[in-house]
Amino acid sequence: MRILNKLQAEASALVITMIVIFIAVACIGTAVHVTTTTARQTDSSRDFSTLRSAAEGALDFAYGIWVEKVNTTFGPVSNKTLNDALVTVPSFAATNGVSVSYDASAGYSGPQITGIDLAQYGQAYGPLTANSNPPSTKVPLIDNTGRNKFPGWLGMNTSYLASVKMSATFLGNRTVKYGVKRAINYTTVPLFQATAFFEDDMELYRPAPMTIDGLVHTNGKASVSQGSAGGGSGGGLTFTGNLSYVTGYLDSTAPYPADDPVWRQTHSPTTDWWSGYVANAAFPPNYPAGFDQQVTEVTRMEPLGVDAATILSATPPPYNITTNHNSDSARELIEPPNTYVDPITHVITSTNSFPDTQAIADRRVYNKAGIRIRISKTGTTTTYTVTTANGATLTAAQKTALTNALSQTSMYDRREATNVDVTSFDLSAALSTLNASTAKFNGILYIDDISSTGYADPKAIRLVNGSTLPSNGFTVGSENPIYIQGDYNTSGARVPSAVFADAVTILSNAWKDSNSSGALSARNANDTTVNTAIVCGFVPSEWVNPVTHETYGYSGGLNNFPRFLEDWSSNTFTYKGSMIELFASGIATGQWDTGSVYHPPNRAWSFDSNFIDNPPPGSLTAVTVSRGAFVRF
């Protein structure tokens, strides 16, 4: 019995030992399998990542080619243009004996970009041909996350699809393929859909009570604060639309220099040159829908359609000392290609020795104009030269009618502190000629006076009797300052209108040249309405006058973008339009001040919503380009 029990015990032990060995072997096998599988998965993941990086890199290359083409074409481009540009494609060096190539079996010899027919979005367009540009549609401006990139803004969007498919054979003869695509968009954004667009810092330092509706954007810093003019926290500044900024937002009472360390080196942080300054006080404007809903930090809008740094070689006057005077600043938009303003003497200098880039040439108001009037003077003799371009034709009698609408006078500009020789253009006298069907006028008039002898001899253009404008729209451009006297574009239905100038000053219906040099009490304004877009220069805060070397104070802000010279007390300046600041003034560089210069009007300002679908002739557009997320296919 003892022997039997012993044998049974030994047998049980053997069985247990065998079971343990079996389990151990099984575990080892499982571990080997898991390790092998994990290694294969790691290899596969690494291989996949390599292929994905190559594919996404190829698409980034294609995107760079696309950006170059749209920026040099200044608009959407055809499939053929892109295909020709993508003949040379990036190649990928072998890594660890593994080569990555384009998947020829799927039709890819490199990355591809094709225009998207918007029919897939529910709009009926015909098939795209190789040489046709993709169609455009009006869209809100969104970023690649689907969020509104510039809240409230609309653009004309042209979409493309960039795609590539790549293949590679890795160790173990494993073939891996990867396809990726993304949408890319070229969107033109009319600038005349904003109440105000500033290329530089936009300031509104505690203005008299005012409400600004519509969109407001600055490519610089937005410095806005409310309060009654000159001090106190009364009054109000209200934005009813969206305000967007690029480099910063500030709502203190020291809008420009308070956070500027350079300024602090030469100024006291507890004093300021603005009347009523209160150190470290903040008076934020009113935002009816809430700050978070109305104020947005955004990326730049390019007002020239491309990156300005690629075509403009210098900062605005007084620093435009580059060898090529045809690329000094965005002020080129209001200058003819053969003149420039000397930043020291203010003389309009004629020259044909500087080249014009296509990007600038296409945007000059002078180049767009159908009728051009040049004023020159020798002694007491004034000569008017009228020429046509862009399809316009004028008879000798019509040219005479236009010159008869011009007259010479002089007035004192209290802000400039000097007499100004003014050429007045009587629109009522010129209207029948500008409206004549035989003239084939495109609605853009360019007029300039190049006879200034220097800083103390400024010349300007004045628009008078402009309540009725040419029926198909009217844009006036000049490299001189422009005065708008009296009601403008107010008779009957408003027409799309714009004024491009070195500076724009509003003179009321009550203005008299004979009182221009008198005290402020002799320059009483009355209610006046102006309906036009304004594109002009500005004198920024802390600007250094290159002639006097004086450092200026506050710019006067957005509320003084159109300038004033009268006592507007209890009178209203009604304005409907769009205000665009792109450059520093080169001629009208007098320092902003109230005092004896003017007393502010009641401001009833609003955006002209007609501009959205019917902008003025020669309108400007900004451009944004964007990319969607990578999508595997």
Where does each model-flagged region fall?
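Aliphatic-rich helix starts adjacent to a transmembrane/signal segment
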Residues: 2-5, 15-54
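A generic secondary-structure signal for well-formed alpha-helical elements
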Residues: 22, 31, 35, 59-70, ...
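Membrane-proximal N-terminal amphipathic helix
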Residues: 40-72, 218
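C-terminal globular interaction/adhesion domains in large, modular proteins
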Residues: 71-163, 170-174, 189-633
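Long amphipathic alpha-helical scaffold segments
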Residues: 166-169, 181-183
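A short, surface-exposed beta-strand/turn
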Residues: 175-189
